[in-house]
Amino acid sequence: MSEYLKALFELKELRQKFIFTLLMFVIYRLGSHIPIPGINPEALRDFLKAFEGSVFALYDIFSGGNLGRLTVFALGVMPYISASIMMQLLTVAIPSLQRLAKEEGDYGRYKINEYTKYLTLFVATVQSLGIAFWIRGQVSPKGIPVVENPGISFILITVLTLVAGTMFLVWIADRITEKGIGNGASLIIFAGIVANFPNAVIQFYEKVKTGDIGPLTLLLIIALIIAIIVGIVYVQEAERRIPIQYPGRQVGRQLYAGRKTYLPIKINPAGVIPIIFAQALLLIPSTLLNFVQNPFIKVIADMFQPGAIFYNFLYVTFIVFFTYFYTAVLINPVELAENLHKAGAFIPGVRPGQDTVKYLERIINRLIFFGALFLSVIALIPILISVWFNIPFYFGGTTALIVVGVALDTFRQIETYLIQKKYKSYVRR
């Protein structure tokens, strides 16, 4: 940590990246206080108290509290996350997109990114329409309308405002990725979660103060939070090292001995992405179903609330699926085996070619299984604890995993930058 702080002060380029990222965060937080035109803030606040502890509250966490205040950034970057999921699935399913992503290089990546933005626009429009039609007819418990003039003009302005806010956030995310430190979309979600920490701590303290959370439960929560953070750091940093052997070679009269190294594969290569993807998918039906005022639909909507058996089952299923899916996107055993063969390297005790592919597949599948199991436990246990002990849902494994995971990924990128900087200075000498 001290090395990173020292580098921020000493290296001008890294300092500029850090300042640029902070500036983007400031713009994001300023926009988080600009409400949608036509909303009565007090009536909205009273109305949304009924949704505390629901999936709506979880979405509000990911949006940095913007959804609960219905600001211009109410949708956050979740439409972009949802569009990215759809695009990756389409890339696997449609051969032309698959060729574009794998064979066209920078141009292919540019086009895939462009299609993702168009899809984001569509998803954001649908979600903003849903919010506009839902909120315009709502009233607070005191009978005060949430929307002062719920006409067609309110719907149009709300849709335009929310879509523009989401696309602006996507632009900010791209700028952070390009000119700042870390992954822009992940950092925006990270910033939103961290911004809500003070309110969550205050709410938690109030429950302790009033006796809603007893001493034993408090100790259990603290122990759980520490265990989750330690477990996340351990699994995110742990890796399986596959031994690699390079044969000896002769150059002229000089004989070079073979050397040994290793191929590092993360225990959880997918990181926090499966959790974010699973949440993004579950939030869509949960949000849409809550918009419909119908007794039968309400029963179905309750099945999609955190803590419900059906919700937990789908949550774990999506986490496992996206862990396998995203790891398959990141790590291709066939390509790894081909690259080893081209470099003249081999795995001791394993024949090159198909045997190497099968060996790598076996190891990767074991790692994926452990990673999926870990993510499921981290995501599910805090939800169950929050339901059993009536603890604020904010202190969940999902938020902890995202915060710790994004922080580790960002520090890793800084470390990579420092290594590249040292290597360049060494080459110049």
From Swiss-Prot:
Membrane topology (UniProt): Multi-pass membrane protein
Stretches assigned to the Cytoplasmic side: 1-13, 99-111, 179-181, 236-267, 330-360, 415-429
Gene Ontology molecular function: protein transmembrane transporter activity; signal sequence binding
Annotated GO CC locations: cell envelope Sec protein transport complex; plasma membrane
Residues exposed to the Periplasmic side: 41-64, 133-154, 201-214, 287-307, 386-393
Annotated coiled-coil segments of the chain: none
Pfam families: SecY
Membrane-inserted regions that do not cross the membrane: 65-72, 73-77, 78-98
UniProt-listed InterPro entries: SecY, SecY/SEC61-alpha, SecY_CS, SecY_dom_sf
UniProt GO BP: protein transport by the Sec complex; SRP-dependent cotranslational protein targeting to membrane, translocation
Keywords, comma-separated and alphabetical: Cell inner membrane, Cell membrane, Membrane, Protein transport, Translocation, Transmembrane, Transmembrane helix, Transport
Residue spans crossing the bilayer: 14-40, 65-98, 112-132, 155-178, 182-200, 215-235, 268-286, 308-329, 361-385, 394-414
Subcellular localization: Cell inner membrane
HAMAP family assigned: SecY
Function of the molecule: The central subunit of the protein translocation channel SecYEG. Consists of two halves formed by TMs 1-5 and 6-10. These two domains form a lateral gate at the front which open onto the bilayer between TMs 2 and 7, and are clamped together by SecE at the back. The channel is closed by both a pore ring composed of hydrophobic SecY resides and a short helix (helix 2A) on the extracellular side of the membrane which forms a plug. The plug probably moves laterally to allow the channel to open. The ring and the pore may move independently.
Family note: Belongs to the SecY/SEC61-alpha family.
Complexes and interactors: Component of the Sec protein translocase complex. Heterotrimer consisting of SecY, SecE and SecG subunits. The heterotrimers can form oligomers, although 1 heterotrimer is thought to be able to translocate proteins. Interacts with the ribosome. Interacts with SecDF, and other proteins may be involved. Interacts with SecA.
Protein name: Protein translocase subunit SecY
Species: Aquifex aeolicus (strain VF5)
